[in-house]
Amino acid sequence: DEDVMNIIRVEKPVGVVVAFGGQTAIKLTKHMAEHGVNILGTPPDAIDAAEDRERFDELLEQLKIKRPQGFTVMTCDEALEVANKIHYPVLMRPSYVLGGQNMIIAFNDDDIKEYMAIILDQGIENPVLIDKYLMGTELEIDAICDGEDILSPGIREHIERTGIHSGDSIAVYPAWNVSDSLINRIIECSKKLAIALNTKGLVNIQYIAYHDEIYVIE
């Protein structure tokens, strides 16, 4: 944080674009905004709404867009309670992380205990996300939005099963194993989300196609 702010004080930029810096830049957005830095593009509050599980779930409910059943937890006991409530297998990952970093598929209580021990040992700051694992087809769309409309070059289909870090996944473009109706649904949901979040610039949304339904992952 201090290194970035030192550079900003020296360079005195008109504003800062965080869309090209990965998760590191996303995490710095709130800090920079609180220190008076002009964030160009998507507003900091909109970025937080996309990253915060409770706020994002509320938005999806308003837009009538489905997502796998899931909860946030801070302790191992909470994680075990949630996993047994929604039933194994479950997908576990830290919040405020893009692309499935540090993500696992847990099949039993021992997996939960081992994962939470590692996360808690690292010093947890944000909740851990636990979702019902759906063995479907993972799809991903990149687009650019001006706040009123979106433009996307297409939809990628991941070859690996859902739950694999996107940086380690192979994807094909365009998606070849998905019906036209599901593709149209993805485009429709992506436009709704991008506009509802007041997106100005790049947006990436990941979905699961499962039993002819579309679910948002992140």
Segments (PLM) and residue ranges:
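N-terminal beta-alpha lobe that positions the nucleotide/phosphoryl donor
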Residues: 1-205, 209-218
